Amino acid sequence: MKKVVEVFLLFLLLVFTPHAKGTGNSPPGKPTLNRCRSPEKETFTCWWEPGSDGGLPTTFALYYRKETSETVYECPDYHTAGKNSCFFNKNDTSIWVNYNITVVATNALGSTFSDPVDIDVVYIVKPNPPERVTVIVLEDKSWPFLRVSWEPPHKADTRSGWITLVYQIRVKLEQEKDWETHHAGQQKMFNVFSLRSGGTYLVQVRCKPDHGFWSEWSSTSYVKVPDYFHREKSVWILIMVFSAFIFLILTWLLHMNSHSLKHCILPPVPGPKIKGFDNQLLKNGKSEELFSALVVSDFPPTTSYNYEDLLVEYLEVNVPEEQELMLEENKDLHDGCLKSECSTSDSDSGRGSCDSHTLLMDKCGEAKEEERQTDQERMGTEAEDMVSPDMSSGRVKTWPSVFSPLPQYSSNTLDEQSSLEMAKQHYLSDSQFLPSSTSSYLTQPGHGTKEALGPSYWEFCLSNKQPHLLHPQTQARQQLQAHSDVDISSIGRKQAPAGLQSPLLRPTEYVEVQRVNEEDMVHLQPVVSGCGQNNCSPQMPQGEDYSKVKGVDSDNVLLLQRNMMEEDRCPCEHQETNGVKENCYTSSTVTTTQKPTAMPVQDEMVLGMNGYVDTATMCILPTY
Amino acid sequence: MAQRKTNGSKLFMMVLYMVAACSAIPISDLLDRASQRSDTLHSLSTTLTQDLDSHFPPMGRVITPRPSMCHTSSLHTPIDKEQALQVSEADLLSLVRSLLQAWRDPLVILSTSANTLPHPAQNSISTKVQELLEHTKSLGDGLDILSGKFGPAAQSISSLPYRGGNDISQDRISRLTNFHFLMSCFRRDSHKIDSFLKVLRCRAAKLQPEMC
């Protein structure tokens, strides 16, 4: 019983003793060998991590065993490598041999063994960092670069080839946070390019054995790259100067060629250009010079003319005997540039001279000066337009616009005829062209009229005064007559040129008032005499021609007289102002003057008997 | 890849043969070439071992046969640096050649075994073993030619027969264990070969200190 109590008490004592202490001692916790390293493959060190110490002072011991023997050795050196470490020196280190290492922690209460670790020295090599890292700044063609050089760790025996190290360097700018890593292989020197001028660089180097672990990074080396900005700047300055120079040159060139450039970029709008027409003169208002210039260049002369003079009371149309003469005349006229001069003198004895008062009305001309002016101007541009022969100075006051067209004739293949026509056309077409003026009425035969002017018509402005419509010169006169003849005949010859031919040949032809335009211009068209309604081949101007102006009656009706027989007068006669009868153009009297009177024109068309064309004052002159 | 390796080895042999014939190529370059190959060899074996370890059951460690039981352990190789540096070049070369020779057959067995190895990374392991085989063969052939330059001592090769048997045990654990054991033996021996060749290279390249 007592024994039981004693045992019980002892037991209690044993149980409570630890609790009485409060801290609770225990055998040490299990230490762990966390790493072993060899810096040069000749020695190595192992470090362990102690476990809990159990509240009591604990001692550690490391025991190892080589694979070749069963002998257990204790760590020879606990202090060289620091606390909780074991250093194996060269004598104790064998390579290509497995070590079985165990750490034992011991305290008063007991000891604890760590887990054993097998290591082979050759597999745990981690060298020291490279030593004596130097960085210098060198220049490569004025561009700086870093040269980094170092030494292997002094312990590592690379000379004999026992350990082979490869290196790595890393560089960064002071203010940056990312490193730039370069692999340097086995060499002990490295160049770093692409530096920023004026920056401070940090350089570090580390190494690794061929089959081992990387060393720690060496201590940082600082290097400052000198400024080479000024060198860059000088280059920039050069570039700026050069470009400024080039810019100046370009500006100067541009300035020099500004005109041509302007022409290139904004070409001037071409305006209508009349040969010999001087815009400046026109602007200045000097019409005489202007028109004289035109006359010079084959234009109907438009010197100041007296419209009144231009007007003729009646148109005297003569049929020249010989065609050749006419032709010649025509040619002359054709060739020459006839100035428009209206001379009052009428040397023409009455062959349809411009000055003939019977042709044109004076009033017409006077009144229509303005209109003529405009007409004249128009004339140039409107080739096909009606030309009213309106010559101020000329006796014949024809509207400027009357004269233009006889395109058909111009297109006539027959030269003579064409020339004839030309002549006529000239005569007709020139407003400026003073029919009364001697010479050059006929300007440019083909001027503007070469083309097939549909209707050839010519308007006459009949005026009282009938200045000689035809130019004073005989030639001209004749030609004029011829012209008039031709014109007359050709007027209204809308037909094919073929048709024109024959009528052209015929000296005497009809003149038919084609129409009266609003300017009181009488458009005459030749009538093919003898052509019936249907089948008038214009080619046969039968013997009807009238180019004889009989007179102008009071109503400003130009009366034309037919010269010859009238047998074949065209039965179909009626006025068509735009008579588009196929082949037949009949003459019609034309009362000109105004539009209002245009109607009457038609009415009076039948004035003429026998197919005459009573070219009364067709046109125009209404308002005078 | 295999053809490339054989071509490479052939080329290497040709080069060495030419060297033997004409001695136009310096030894240091040849040794440099050889050490590069051995370096590759060892790296491969290290990778292979790590692949094996990734899935190797830790408990297998306990029953891992000790490395001293490698079939090449009878070969006396230097165990530290002083000893290694005292060995002559011819002897070093002879050691290297012996080791290479000793591993030709076991590697074949390993290669065969790797095809059916019960391991998750069996494919890559098999490929790597194949490479090992080729590298070893080419290196051995090259060094056979090179040894002519080093004198008669380099010609002697110790015979280290492998007696492990063709058929590594039947059960899975045993097979894996054996495979792992062989690989660890080979890893060490390849490191030896590499180290010796690099020492030789450094010795031969007296005029080129940067090689060391």
From Swiss-Prot, chain B:
Biological process according to GO: positive regulation of cell population proliferation; positive regulation of receptor signaling pathway via JAK-STAT; response to nutrient levels
Keyword annotations: Disulfide bond, Hormone, Secreted, Signal
Cellular component terms (Gene Ontology): extracellular space
Cystine crosslinks: C70-C185, C202-C212
Record's subcellular location: Secreted
SUPFAM superfamilies for the chain: 4-helical cytokines
InterPro entries the UniProt entry points to: 4_helix_cytokine-like_core, Somatotropin/Prolactin, Somatotropin_CS
Tissue specificity of this protein: Pituitary gland.
One Gene Ontology molecular-function label: hormone activity
Entry keyword Ligase: no
Signal peptide: 1-24
Keyword Disulfide bond: yes
Pfam families: Hormone_1
Superkingdom, natural source: Eukaryota
Protein name, entry field: Prolactin
Organism whose genome encodes this protein: Dicentrarchus labrax
Underlying gene: prl
